[in-house]
Structure formats: C-alpha cells, structure tokens
From Swiss-Prot:
Example GO biological process: adenine catabolic process
Catalytic reactions on record: adenine + H2O + H(+) = hypoxanthine + NH4(+)
Residues in the signal sequence: none
Protein's gene: ade
E.C. number(s) listed in UniProt: 3.5.4.2
Entry keywords, A to Z: Hydrolase, Manganese
Family to which this protein belongs: Belongs to the metallo-dependent hydrolases superfamily. Adenine deaminase family.
Cofactor(s), names only, from the UniProt record: Mn(2+)
A GO term for molecular function: adenine deaminase activity
A family per Pfam: Adenine_deam_C
Domain of life per record: Archaea
Organism: Methanothrix thermoacetophila (strain DSM 6194 / JCM 14653 / NBRC 101360 / PT)
Record protein name field: Adenine deaminase
InterPro entries xrefs: Adenine_deam (IPR006679), Adenine_deam_C (IPR026912), Amidohydro-rel (IPR006680), Metal-dep_hydrolase_composite (IPR011059), Metal_Hydrolase (IPR032466)
Length: 567
C-alpha cells in the first residue's frame, strides 16, 4: 500500500475498504472511550469519519479496541503448531504474540526457531519471537543445542526477532560472566529489547541486574517484589499461566501513574486452558478488580507494542495497523479484524488459511537398546536421596529414606510411594541414563513417561517396575516423543512428533489426548491432578531443591551433582 493512498483515504478522497460504524473507541492515547466510525484502507486505519466504504459493519453499542498482544509466551507449552495456536487464540482477540522459543531451541537449536517462524507464515496473527538467551540452561545436563553470541547475533538480525529472550542466568549477570554479558551487549548494540527473569532478586543484586540493561520481568509472584522492580526501572509483565497464576496478587501494584510500565502475558499455558482463556480473560479480571478499563487494555496493547518497538501497532488510530477487536460491554470479544480483514466472529475463526506441515529433523537420537539393565540400581548403601514432589508445586524437597532392596538391587516401594525415576538422553546418543527415586506420584503399577522435560527435554520416566519403564521409553521413541501411560502395554498416548514437544493435530484433539493420558495415569494410582506437569519439571536443575538429569541427581542449592546414596 502506498502512503499517498492512505492519506487520500483519510481525507475521504478514496473509498475505504471497511467501515466500523457506530462503535465506542477505547482510545489508548487519550485515555478516553469515545464514539468513532473507524475507516480502514489497505490494512491500516485511515481515520474516524470516512464518508463511505466498500463494506460497512455496524458495531452500535459495542467497544472497539486494539488487538491484544501476549508479551511473553512459550508456545511449546500449548503443544500446538503456530497455525493451530492461532485458531485457539485469535477468536479471543490476541493478534500478536512475543514468543520465546527456548524449548524447541534446546532440542533443535536455531533450526527449531526458524522452523516455527516458517510455520507461522500466513497465519492471521503476528508471530514474533525473542532470541533465547540461555540454551542450554545449565552445564548439568545434555541438551540438543547451544546458542552462543554468534547464533544470537544472527537471530537478532531477523526483523521478526524483537529482543533477547528472558535472561534466566541472573547470577551470571550480576557476577559479570563474560559470555553472558556478551549476549546482553550484542542485543543492546542492535537496539533490541532485553527480557528478564529474576524471581526473588532484590536490593543491590536487583540494581545490578537492572544496570545490565534488563528491561522487564514476568517472574514476580508478590506485589512487594514487583514494586521493587518497578522502582528499579524494570517493566512488569503480569503473568497468568497454567501453573503460575500471579494476576490476583499483582493487580495490587496497579496505580494510575505506573500503568505504562505494566504488560500482560501468559508465559506457559497448556492446551486445556488455552481453549478457555487468554489475554481477554486477564483484561476482564483486571477490570473486575477495579482497574480503569482503558488502562487494562493499554497493558495488553500499546504498552507491549512500545516496549518491543512495534511501530504502528497496538492502537486504533490513523496510520496504525488495523488489528482491531470489537467487544460487548462486558469486554467479551465479538469480532476480530487482522490487518483490515475480519478473521473471527463470536468465538469462531472465520479466516481460511493453510496449516503448514513442513518436514523437521528427528529429535529422537537415543542409543539403543533400552533394557531392564538401563534402569538397574545396585544397592551400594543404606540411605538414599529421594526427590519429594507435592501436588500443584514445581519445587521439590530432598527426602532421606531407606530403600527397598531385592537381590542386591533397589526396587520401587509402592507402600511408601517411592518409585524409580530415570532421565534418558535423547539428543546425541550418549547413552546417558540418570537414575533416581521419587516420592509423590503414587503409582501402584506401570509407568508414565514424557519427552517434555524442561529445559533440555530429554526423556523422563517414572515407574513401578523396569519392564514398564522400558516399554514407556520405547513407545515414546517410536512415536517421536510425547506423553505415555503404560500398564503392560501402552494404554494412552499423546504423540508430539515435532521436536518431542509439539503436535500436528487440532487443539480439540490435543486436549482430548492429554486428558486421556492423565486419566490413564490416575488409573495406575497417581493422585496428582496433572502428573505430566509435575513430571516435566523434575529434570529442571535451576529450581530447588533436588532434581534429576541424564547425568544424575542435582542439588540445586549447591548447583552440582550428588550421589543417590547418602550413606
């Protein structure tokens, strides 16, 4: 589109493509809600009083607002391809996402990020990413890839890469680790936003983190923590995900004068939640808590647009992209317009687009065979370290226990809820199998396994017996990754053949399969609401207290490996 034509359309000299007539505009610039007839030409807003248009939509008694922006999301948590993700969230008014693809990057590296970007071409939403800053997350496990300064610099040259992803290595920042600072410097040199991740950081350490050019954080769980970060110049992203839900606490920080520095994000939202809520739900909740509606919408639109340098995005105003939602007075989304075209109405996607199915390299590079011997634990001591898990928590504890021993081998002890757990390396065919014991899953028989295992996403399996563990791992390998519940044979599965993280199926099918696998784990004895969510975090060696990787047990507080036997 020529700018001359948009100017002519704004003056009424050219007929507009579309006119939204009779609505009330939520104006994120003036802070008002005022009557406006919105004219659209060539995918952009032309003006507020165009005399005619090829198509007119009456939006009398409705609110008009910019399309929502999810300021930080790991799309891999949805287990959906970008096209299917769009089908789920576009009808709810989310038209731009800032995705941090560090999950697929840990498996496939730069190729994984490029794959997602190619698959997102042509979908009715703006799919942008940040360059993952911490791949791998630690040196305590085997990942599928590593992103150094050169890879990050190359990624940041892509216009779709709008920043450096969350800098989880805050110790490396404040202690001036050279490779860490090099990543920050290259992002700053390219004028890209630098995203943060600093749960619980305060005082001088927080000031040091902010001084390193960190610009935002989505990890705050307490209002006091968020206010301290705001005072240090760090913008706050209020998060409402599946596991981490911080909205009710963080609405306490919202003041009339600080709202330009607050944004909204989902971070990690699984498919069972994504079909029911997204940024639209957060906006309604914030308004219900007493926040001015215009301020609530600013947090989901113009604020993240400015934060990430998205020019001509995040507002309904002349010269801005026509990414628009039409809402009723309860702030429910009724119509969605992306780049000037209506793409959804009354909760249903109306746009037609191709769901790309591109070839992707295998991510199951396991040294075979996997046998009962792979999970054998010789009884070489009297007291063992057991990973203790609790319902709806990702923190673990270290439990000292006397193991059940048979014929000189440690076996699972279902009476005391102590089961075998193993992490099988799947990226480089190293043959690494980390072995341990875990309490809290409650399985009485069989095994469950997953290739979703933060952050390196090796295969993790928990089982009552070695034979079931073998079958579970073999089942995952054969289907290219996913979730399985096994009782003699595989009784339920959720295939995730794309990097062992993503499904090619529709969101409804993914939800059904996920629920079936979780139900199957309950039939094996688990009382956890979501045993696979708990399983996926057992191998994350950056969250206290005791974890397991393909290289063995990790004491997170000591940031090092520890033996299974304490004595």
């Amino acid at each position: 589109m020529r700018i001359e034509d948009l100017i002519a359309a704004a003056r009424g000299e050219l007929e507009a493509d579309l006119l939204l007539e009779g609505g009330k505009l939520v104006n994120v610039f003036s802070g008002e809600i005022h009557r406006a007839d919105i004219s659209i030409y060539g995918g952009f807003v032309a003006g507020f009083d165009c005399p005619s248009a090829r198509r007119v939509i009456s939006v009398e008694d409705h609110l008009i607002a910019p399309g929502s922006i999810d300021a930080h999301v790991h799309i891999e948590s949805s287990m959906l391809m970008p096209s299917e993700y769009a089908r789920a969230v576009v009808p709810r008014g989310t038209l731009t996402v800032i995705a941090d693809p560090h999950e697929i990057a840990n498996v496939l590296g730069v190729d994984g990020i490029s794959y997602l970007l190619r698959c997102a071409e042509g979908i009715p939403m703006r799919f942008l990413v940040t360059a993952p800053s911490c791949v791998p997350a630690t040196h305590l496990e085997t990942s599928g890839a590593a992103l150094g300064v050169s890879e990050i610099a190359s990624l940041l040259d892509d216009h779709r890469v709008v920043g450096l992803g969350e800098m989880m290595n805050y110790p490396g920042v404040i202690h001036r680790d050279k490779p860490v600072l090099a990543k920050l410097k290259v992002a700053a040199s390219k004028n890209k936003t630098i995203c943060g991740h600093a749960p619980g950081l305060g005082g001088r350490d927080l000031h040091a983190y902010a001084a390193a050019l960190i610009e935002d954080d989505h990890e705050c769980t307490r209002a006091e923590e968020a206010m301290e970060q705001l005072r240090a110049g760090i913008c706050i992203m209020i998060r409402e995900g599946s596991a981490a839900r911080n909205l009710d606490e963080l609405v306490k920080i919202i003041r009339e004068y600080n709202t330009p520095n607050i944004m909204l994000c989902t971070d990690d939202l699984d498919p069972r939640d994504i079909v029911h809520r997204h940024i639209d739900h957060m906006i309604r909740r914030i308004i219900e808590a007493g926040t001015d509606p215009v301020a609530a919408i600013q947090m989901a639109t113009i604020n993240p647009a400015r934060h990430f340098g998205l020019r001509r995005t995040g507002a309904v105003a002349p010269g801005y992209r026509a990414d628009i939602i039409v809402m009723d007075h309860d702030f429910n989304v009724r119509r969605v317009i992306f780049e000037g075209e209506e793409v959804a109405r009354d909760g249903r996607l109306t746009a037609s687009f191709e769901s790309k199915r591109l070839p992707v390299q295998t991510s199951m590079n396991v040294r075979l065979p996997i046998t009962r011997e792979s999970f054998r634990i010789p009884a070489t001591g009297r007291i063992v370290r057991v990973i203790g898990v609790a319902p709806n928590q990702i923190l673990t504890e270290t439990i000292a226990a006397r193991p059940e021993v048979r014929n000189g081998e440690v076996i699972s002890d279902t009476r005391n809820d102590i089961l075998k757990v193993a992490v099988v390396e799947r990226h480089r065919a190293t043959g690494n199998v980390g072995l341990g014991l875990v309490s809290g899953f409650g399985l009485k028989r069989g095994a469950i396994a997953s290739s979703v295992s933060h952050d390196s996403h090796n295969i993790i399996v928990v089982g009552e017996d070695e034979e079931s563990m073998v079958r579970a791992v073999e089942s995952l390998i054969s289907m290219g990754g996913g979730w399985v519940s096994v009782d003699g044979t595989t009784i339920a599965s959720l295939p995730l053949p794309i990097a062992g993280l993503l499904s090619e199926r529709r969101v409804e099918d993914v939800v059904e399969e996920a629920e079936n696998v979780i139900a199957a784990s309950h039939s094996l004895g688990s009382e956890l609401e979501d045993s696979f969510m708990t399983l996926s975090f057992l191998a994350l060696p950056v969250i206290p207290e005791l974890r397991i990787t393909d290289r063995g047990l990790v004491d997170v507080r000591e940031f090092g490996h520890v033996p299974l036997f304490m004595e």
